Amino acid sequence: MITSSKKIVSAMLSTSLWIGVASAAYAETTNVEAEGYSTIGGTYQDGNPQPINIYSVNGVQAINFVNRGDFAEYDVSVSTAGEYSIEYLIGTSIASGSAVEISVLVDGNWQSAGSTNVPLGQWDNFQALAANNNISLAQGTNRIKITGAGTHDWQWNLDAFSLTLVTPENPDNPDNPDNPDDGNTGQPGTPFTIEMEAFDATGSDDPRAQGMVIGERGYPEDKHTVVDSNQTTDWVDYNINFPVSGNYRIEMLASGQTSHATAILFVDNVQINEVAVDTGNQAVFLDFELTDSTYISAGAHTIRVQSGSQINEFSWMWFGDALTFTPLDGGSTDGDADNDGVLDSVDTCPNTPAGAQVDANGCEIIVDNDTDNDGVDNSIDQCPNTPAGAQVDANGCEIVAVVDADNDGVEDSLDMCPNTPAGAPVNGQGCADSQLDADNDGVSDDIDQCPSTPAGSVVDGTGCIVVTPPADSDNDGVVDTLDMCPNTAAGLTVDSQGCALSQLDSDNDGVTDDIDQCANTPSGETANATGCSSSQEGGGTDPDTPQPGLLYGELAGAMNVSDTNPNWERTTDLLQTEDSVKGNTTEVYTGFIYDADGHISFYEHIDDSVRLYIDGVLVLSNDSWEASSQTTDLNLTPGTHEIELRIGNADGGSGAVDGIGFGIDVDGGTNFVHPSTLSESIFTSVGEETGNPDLEQEGDIIVELESFVFTSTNGRVGSDSVEGFSPTATGVNWVTNGDYGDYMVTFEEPGTYGAYITISAANDGSYGARVDVDGWPVAWGYFGGTGSWDVSSENLLYGGTFVVEQAGEKVVRVEAIGGSDWQWSGDRVRFTRLGDVTAIPSPIYNPDDHFVAEIQGPQTDVTYLKKPVEIPANKKVLKSDVWYTYPQNRELEGYDNFGATGAFWGHPPEHDFYDDTVIMDWAVDAVYAFQAEGYEYTARGEFDWGYGWFTEYTTNPQPHYVRTLDDRNVRMTFMGYLSHDGYNNNWLSNHSPAFVPFMKSQVDQILKANPDKLMFDTQTNSTRSTDMRDFGGDFSPYAMENFRVWLSKKYSTGELAALGINDINSFDYGDFLRAQGVTHTSWSNAGDTLSGNIPLQEDYIYFNRDVWNQKFAEVLDYIRQQQPDIEIGASTHLFESRGYVFNENLTFLSGELNLGARTTISELPTNILVHLKGAQAVDKTLVYFPYPWEFDELRLQDAPRFGRGWVAQAYAYGGLFSIPANVWVGGEVWTWSPGADNYRDIYLFVRAQADLLDDYTSYSKVGLVHAMYSSMKAGFIDGGNQIQSSTKLLTEGNINFDLLVFGDEGYPVVPRPEDFDKFDHIFFDGDEQYLTAEQQALLDQQGDKVRHIGQRGTVSGIEITVSISGTESNETVSAVSRIHETDAAAPYVVHLVNRPFAGGVTPTLNNVEVAIPQSYFPEVVTGATLHLPDGTSTSLTLSTNADGDVVLPVNNLEVWGILELAH
């Protein structure tokens, strides 16, 4: 029997032999894979169910079990009729009697071309074997039969065979067009077309214009690449070699909506004609006859088309697509042998060198005054060193091709505000302040003097809250906002809250304080007319006698289930369940409940946690604020039962969420009501009330908040015109987040203290306060509103350890914290002594335990990007991995069968991060449980969401925060207004000496859970504080100190002096800028795009990145020491170049990214592709998910299936897109599910095609130069306009490309020689201007491989052409080519991504053809299979078009398909 054995000659070697054959005179070769037969048959009985078998061997498929008389028939298409030679890739272990015969079916009869003996070799060692005879084939499809024709029972195994044209039927009349690169535009007598974007030069005769650029116009289904940004007098030139002399008609395909616009035609600087150009719509294209006839001689000529105006008005004009030249007569046969544009009959210098300028006699004109060969004389050339091949304007300066209709500096495809007023400065999305209203108060940002007005506020014309002077309606000396008793009678003495004794009842016994003789009547006891109860007059109640109501008290802890009820007081109505719960507090209700029939059920919907016990049995438990919970009918024994209810809150919001917080149905059903509404109380309890310890005690220290010695702010609330606290007669108001007051307070004795603050706040919100003593936080708390400015409440500041070790005067700071911008009006702070001095826990961070490395100097030498470290195959991120966004997503209904392999964002606990019990609970319950189900767990280290961890790590994080030029904290408002342990979510500075130890501490805690992979959300490291207009730089003391070191290593003393720095040891960059009048605002605006001439600003940007790279490298090295083989990811992207991490220990990229849904959902935008290309350039897989607003836009437009395109595009370009389960969209909606059924098939398709994804890499013949400095100036993290424009142009032309990355002056990386060698062509665009001189010289060494992107149309064989129903449709379907990284024999792959959407759904396409140039891949494509997400795989019939391209027919293409290509 035939068995497989190791192949000796590789398939790649065999194919290289075919290429040699294909380079013969006619070079038409058709390759046929043996397994691609149409039918098989045979006669020999070998026991095999089929006459012939298909098998796999050494990475290829072939046929075996071929016996004498067995045959396979093939349908083979050729474009030219004629004689073809035959070559087989064939092998046999039969010494003699093995032969192969080839026949062709002609008019129903088989005509044999003879047989060829197969020499002895090995079954699976396929060797090239030339047939003895040729075969005659007709143009089109031929039926060919290959037969086992020898005498032996066993014949041969066959891999493939090829047919090469030897003699065409009519070799004297070849129908192939001229090579488009040979200087001829077409054949004599035939029309030819020039694409107008392939201009040779452009410029303008008006100084207000700069010539035309390349852009796009048209409807989504009919896009045209055009010359764009065309203003009056702009022109484009084309150097054209006309094939014949004669009269030509010249037409222009164009659109335009300017009624007075014209197009002027010039031939060799002579005006021929002027015609009107107006189609009424930029998207409607028509042909305009520029001339019906003009004589042009054979040879080279310059054709110019210039825009004009019938009324001489300067304005936007037309958009030109193509020029068509039609010869009107047979043309002269007079030739032009030297191609100098002068016919041979009059050429007196017949051998002119190629490219030379000549006079009318054909003789060379010597020009020596154009040094850079850009066509502009040196005397007027303002840019004398223009790079070779660049397009230039009339001044000799390179043209940057960016489509920007409103001229605001933001390319149209990224412009969220397309009609910006002329000259207005804009942000990264193209919006001027006059087009924005950030706080939605109805006043545009350009005139809004209070840009952060709270929602719903009434504002004036400047956008600031309308404030009326404080009122005092009852004239008692206490303003209404603080007056707790607003109708005090005239003349009465009042307290600080505006209440007279006659208006107060402090013990709630029904007798006012002015006549109450027993001031502290116990709660629940009845008082007489003088305010005294029987127990106060000598009587009492038996504590063992059941009393109405439940005993109520409060305990420390988010859910304290171990400590007993402190029994502060009795509550009969349980209304406390409907109030807010203090932070880090558990409310406890204990006693008895009576139920007559035993049928009873309970309900809760409380933020955060609830536990309900009946007779000691837990019957209700819930830790979710989002979802309510309830019991069924408990079917108790009729009578009295013990009850215990515990309600806990960790932090932030609390209390009833929606409707009632705690409910009961005494009939055991679902008609729940609050207990306070029951006609009879069913609760009793036994025991004495201990009293509320939070009540004021004798000897307490009272701090009146209006008595501060200093006030200021750490925050930034734009609508607050008061810096710090605003004092009133009895308190403070105008308090916003970060405002603080300092007080001198004397503590008479040491001890442990508690702290309370009395505030009022009319609205619901997130309010809080922190108390510092001598610069150290001792107490903090969070609380809700009081419902009115007239109602105040005292709140316990429950957090911290408040210990005074020595008596005496202390500096006490009271600071407003919490989530809301506008905070509270404050009355006082009260300190009560609780006991003796207790031990103070030491902070986790001790600076003495850590070495801080000296800051390194700048990187100045040209260097290479570091390749990521090798990760073992079993631990790598795979291109076919399918990850949940969060591990818990797998538990959602419908999402358990997506073929998932792991999870993206495995969040460690948000609080108590350094409590090993909490960490190990996370390890067991989250990490190990997930891994036990066969998934990989990626644990996430944090920056922004780690703000709470950092507070726990340092206890006092304030010295380590980023500080702006005006000395404010930078709050990370993009993640929400959050606060933890007394500190808001402020930005941690990378410059802090605590930064590296903190990050290492994260690593230590996370690795205790043994996750499979690590990912750090590094995009919010503090380099971003220098990256966006909203934040404004890091001028913290630690940053200033590090900048001094960095500058001293970059500059000499003399150079520093020239910069205005005379003493580097005392230099403070913040003081330096402030002394020159630079403000926070001017710095921020300039820093956003590196404009505005701020001294040392670029140095400062580079310095921040250098320090960030140095410090994070320490962390990455620390990880590698502990886990050498672990994958480490980070949300660092090449196009956020200010914070990019140049480190080999990072092995994949991750994060949230912008996908452009708000721009359009009619087609897949290309802006994300720069990130995928960037990841490819640094050899790291990109794993990502969109920003919340992207899916929210799909929700608003009811287009959940649009995201399928995002997923398909990610995997097609080598990335991973995590499963969109319940996605966070923010706002009042919180989360939204786009539907499991809309995405399941896409992800199962990924897993099914793992062999075509894993270990595959991008394949292209074009490299695109990318200068990282362009991203520095972009103002957003998606790169600059030019790279976005170039990416769009190449993608929608189906020109696959990869990036050649050039760094900036701060980190001047360059491509390696092997990076350049990968590409046949290198394109550059306007961003070339950002290369350093050294980088430009390196690029220039690549010679004529380098050309401007505008010349892409002159290069053949670089694109895969997609057509639909015969119409080229590259902008509709992207054809993304990829090859295996290491296995040259593996199939090639082309991903087909269908880009348009209609109503959020991808239209299914039929009659699609994909044309792949024969020379595109390293080897010729010989077979194809189409794989679709519906589970089908279809073998495709290959054909060849007139250009020799392999053409593949594709049908039923929805959003994505994969072409598997044999070769």
From Swiss-Prot:
Its EC number(s): 3.2.1.158
Highest taxon of the lineage: Bacteria
Cofactors demanded by this protein: Ca(2+)
Listed SMART domains: CBD_IV
Ranges for domain CBM6: 701-832
Pfam families xref list: CBM_6, TSP_3
Record bears the keyword Metal-binding: yes
Signal sequence, renumbered to the chain: 1-27
Propeptide span(s): 28-684
Biased segments, Polar residues type: 518-536
One of the protein's GO biological processes: cell adhesion
PANTHER family cross-referenced by the UniProt entry: RE20510P, THROMBOSPONDIN
Listed name of the protein: Alpha-agarase
Organism this protein belongs to: Thalassotalea agarivorans (Thalassomonas agarivorans)
